[in-house]
């Protein structure tokens, strides 16, 4: 374990929902910071104003907190290295862009959008890769200064070396060498004064004293550019770690919007907000996504504290990871079973409230032990136990007919069970079950036939928590009323 406190960051753009890849990046950055007694920073990279989505920033912050990834510095809590929104750091980027120009590592570019379009079309006609042709790179500083003084609109481009190669080191991939001739002179400051990612992220990481940059492998293509920008300033490089990408469940390519929509129909999602609403737990989500790309056994069950103790960037793997929703179900169900009863009660209660049911804590506390082993998601509690809180149930009449029997015989059984239970002083487990088992034995019926009718009559479901424990919690009055209603429904079918 490293003894040097790490300063890590999660730097999303507020252009959409917090997704699985972002959540894993944040998780790894959080784990490394906590393990080394360092700091975890949230920075909002909102310079792409046109694509910024209202409410996305708040959703990111809410999602991180739901996952338990509390950040030490950020836009809503401040810190020593703020502001933490890039649109609020415009002057900082302008000053750094000016430094690059003055040192000869960048230059103003006055090319109009029309000229750039014509240039690219000509390159494509020649079957060349579209790239800036360096026209303004040839301008003298004096010429550029005159045009700027005249108010001519311009951007700032980074002057990539044209000779040799750039060797950049990634912590899990080793040295990456790329010939410089393959790179364009990228825009680092736009004409509106806002930076591009290439400048802003490098400046912010330095100014915020970030020691470890964990980000998606999608940035590998511009990794040499970023390294050159850092070196142009003469700064020490952070430890770069490019994380593996997530593939769709088939392992072939990234999940499309259509496939993400299909996953929702099956009760899964790649978006944190959806996972919360679908009843997944932060413990299950962290465990699941954390192990995708982390070289530890894929069945290891860990909470955040255990993950902090075991995490190491040395164990991260560069290989793409296929999303496995069955694993999510496994981990989520496991963590539900590990939750203390009081905690689980608090987590499932909102699902009953949302369905318009008044679920009292005392009754939920009785019910939770009956549900825990059957639950995969928190909202399973509503499906499994909604009948406890309804005045009545409305089973499908055909479900009341026992296997191998007809409606008249099933109605007869329902009436007889009603009569037996009316004669019981209470419907406790200890009182009701022996009485009904005695009836089964003397009638010569199959226990599954009798108990099946009772289960559907009382719970409205073919599958439910343990029957007699459920009857005791529901209470004598409701149980008898539901049996009576079932007998009448079966009689109508006769």
Model-derived features: where do they sit?
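N-terminal Rossmann-like or analogous alpha/beta NTP/dinucleotide-binding catalytic cores
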Residues: 2-125, 221-232, 284
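Glycine- and acidic
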Residues: 8-14, 42-46, 208-213, 269-272, ...
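Structural motif
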Residues: 20, 275-283, 318-324, 358-367, ...
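Generic, well-ordered alpha-helical scaffold segments in large soluble proteins
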Residues: 63, 103, 229-232, 278, ...
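Conserved phosphate-binding loops in nucleotide/dinucleotide-binding enzymes
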Residues: 83-87, 189-190, 208-219, 247-287, ...
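Active-site cores that bind ATP or allylic diphosphates and position pyrophosphate for catalysis
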Residues: 107-108, 112-262, 271, 296
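Small-residue-rich helix-loop
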Residues: 341-443
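Charged substrate- and nucleic-acid-binding regions of tRNA-handling and nucleotidyl-transfer enzymes
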Residues: 429-490
């Amino acid at each position: 374990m490293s003894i040097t406190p790490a300063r890590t960051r999660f730097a999303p753009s507020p252009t959409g929902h917090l997704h699985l890849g972002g959540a894993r990046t944040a998780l790894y950055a959080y784990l490394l910071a906590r393990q080394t007694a360092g700091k975890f920073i949230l920075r909002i990279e909102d310079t792409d104003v046109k694509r910024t989505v209202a409410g996305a920033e708040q959703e990111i912050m809410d999602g991180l907190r739901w996952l338990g990834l509390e950040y030490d510095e950020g836009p809503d809590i401040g810190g020593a290295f703020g502001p933490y929104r890039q649109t609020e750091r415009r002057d900082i980027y302008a000053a750094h862009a000016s430094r690059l120009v003055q040192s000869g590592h960048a230059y103003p570019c006055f090319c109009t959008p029309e000229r750039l379009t014509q240039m690219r079309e000509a390159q494509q006609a020649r079957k060349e890769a579209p790239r800036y042709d360096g026209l303004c790179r040839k301008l003298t500083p004096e010429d550029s200064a005159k045009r700027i003084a005249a108010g001519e609109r311009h951007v700032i481009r980074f002057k990539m070396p044209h000779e040799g190669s750039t060797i950049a080191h990634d912590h899990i991939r080793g040295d990456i060498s790329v010939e410089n001739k393959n790179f364009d002179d990228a825009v680092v400051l736009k004409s509106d004064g806002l930076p591009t990612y290439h400048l802003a992220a490098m400046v912010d990481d330095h100014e915020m004293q970030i020691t470890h940059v964990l980000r998606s492998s999608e940035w590998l293509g511009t990794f040499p550019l970023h390294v050159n920008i850092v070196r142009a300033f003469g700064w020490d490089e952070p430890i770069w770690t490019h994380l593996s990408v997530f593939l769709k469940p088939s392992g072939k390519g990234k999940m499309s919007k259509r496939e993400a929509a299909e996953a929702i129909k099956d009760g899964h999602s790649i978006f944190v907000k959806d996972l919360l609403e679908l009843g997944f737990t932060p413990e299950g989500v962290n465990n699941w996504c954390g192990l995708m790309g982390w070289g530890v056994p894929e069945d290891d069950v860990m909470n955040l504290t255990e993950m902090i103790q075991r995490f190491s960037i040395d164990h991260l793997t560069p290989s793409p990871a296929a999303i496995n929703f069955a694993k999510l179900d496994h981990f989520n169900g496991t963590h539900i079973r590990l939750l203390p009863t009081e905690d689980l009660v608090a987590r499932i209660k909102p699902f009953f409230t949302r369905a318009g049911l008044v679920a009292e804590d005392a009754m939920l506390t009785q019910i939770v032990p009956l549900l825990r082993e059957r639950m995969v998601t928190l909202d399973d509690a509503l499906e499994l136990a909604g009948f406890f809180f309804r005045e009545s149930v409305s089973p499908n009449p055909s479900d009341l007919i026992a296997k191998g029997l007809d409606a008249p015989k099933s109605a007869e059984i329902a009436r007889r069970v009603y009569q037996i239970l009316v004669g019981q002083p209470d419907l406790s487990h200890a009182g009701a079950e022996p009485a009904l088992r005695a009836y089964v034995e003397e009638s010569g019926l199959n226990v599954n036939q009798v108990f099946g009718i009772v289960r559907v009559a009382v719970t409205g479901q073919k599958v439910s928590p343990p029957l007699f424990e459920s009857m005791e919690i529901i209470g004598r009055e409701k149980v008898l009323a539901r049996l009576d209603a079932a007998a009448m429904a079966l009689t109508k079918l006769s």
